[in-house]
Amino acid sequence: MGWQRPDGRQPQELRSHQFQRHFTQFALGSVLAQAGQTQVLCTVSFKEGVPKFLEGTGQGWLTAEYRMLPSATRPRQEREFLKLSGRTQEIQRLIGRSLRSAVDLSLLGECTLIVDADVLQADAGTRSLAITGGYIALVDALSALLQQGVLRKSPLRHQVAAVSVGLIDDEPYLDLSYAEDVAASVDFNVVMTGSGQFIEVQGTAEMGSFDRGTLDRLLDVARQGIQELIEIQQRVLAPSHE
């Protein structure tokens, strides 16, 4: 008998995903994203100016910041003040890279989009949920900028979503909870476009190693899950959900 998922899901079943748009008042785009017990507040803001390496190029930029509330995990974690942990820096760079791929930066002018991902509650999958929810917030932010006349043309290039997948008892499991993440011998974070192109694949063997066949199995399961998330994004962004 294989691994029994704590929440009763099938091995290749996503957690229940919910995205509440326009969650805060002042951000151009804001989404409360939930996947099972994991909750991430994703907001998108806009400011004039770009990093120094882009000054004078006429090109814009998108960057991301990621933080966890102290009570997002048990036990309470200390806030990160003067120095960010390596994990935090890695995750916010991943979010930034993933969502930058969705935008034609040349259409922004010398302006910057800032994606903030704040974890309210963590039961694994926070970086994946931040990307999937962050995309929805990004769409709303760009729509607001178009309505305000700040942008003349939408810079959106494609949809982006992400999911985790892991190997437990030699079987692929989709969208891992914390208990499953700990139990997995191999775990991946996969980011893809709406057309099925890969943006980023992060994979690690926690114990031992894995072969090419295992890699392909995990990516196939991740691709299936991301396609479901792409469809959820489309439903959430439909005019009837305004």
UniProtKB/Swiss-Prot annotation:
Keywords tagged on the record: Nucleotidyltransferase, RNA-binding, rRNA processing, Transferase, tRNA processing, tRNA-binding
GO-annotated biological processes: rRNA catabolic process; rRNA processing; tRNA processing
Entry GO MF terms: 3'-5'-RNA exonuclease activity; tRNA binding; tRNA nucleotidyltransferase activity
Domain of life of the native organism: Bacteria
Keyword tRNA-binding: yes
E.C. designation(s): 2.7.7.56
Pfam families, A to Z: RNase_PH (PF01138), RNase_PH_C (PF03725)
Recorded coiled-coil stretches: none
InterPro entries in the cross-refs: ExoRNase_PH_dom1 (IPR001247), ExoRNase_PH_dom2 (IPR015847), ExoRNase_PH_dom2_sf (IPR036345), PNPase/RNase_PH_dom_sf (IPR027408), Ribosomal_Su5_D2-typ_SF (IPR020568), RNase_PH (IPR050080), RNase_PH_bac-type (IPR002381), RNase_PH_CS (IPR018336)
CDD domains: RNase_PH_bact
Keyword rRNA processing set for record: yes
Binding-site residues, phosphate: 87, 125-127
Record field: catalytic activity: tRNA(n+1) + phosphate = tRNA(n) + a ribonucleoside 5'-diphosphate
HAMAP family xrefs: RNase_PH
Similarity section: Belongs to the RNase PH family.
Job of this protein: Phosphorolytic 3'-5' exoribonuclease that plays an important role in tRNA 3'-end maturation. Removes nucleotide residues following the 3'-CCA terminus of tRNAs; can also add nucleotides to the ends of RNA molecules by using nucleoside diphosphates as substrates, but this may not be physiologically important. Probably plays a role in initiation of 16S rRNA degradation (leading to ribosome degradation) during starvation.
Assembly, per entry: Homohexameric ring arranged as a trimer of dimers.
Protein name (database record): Ribonuclease PH
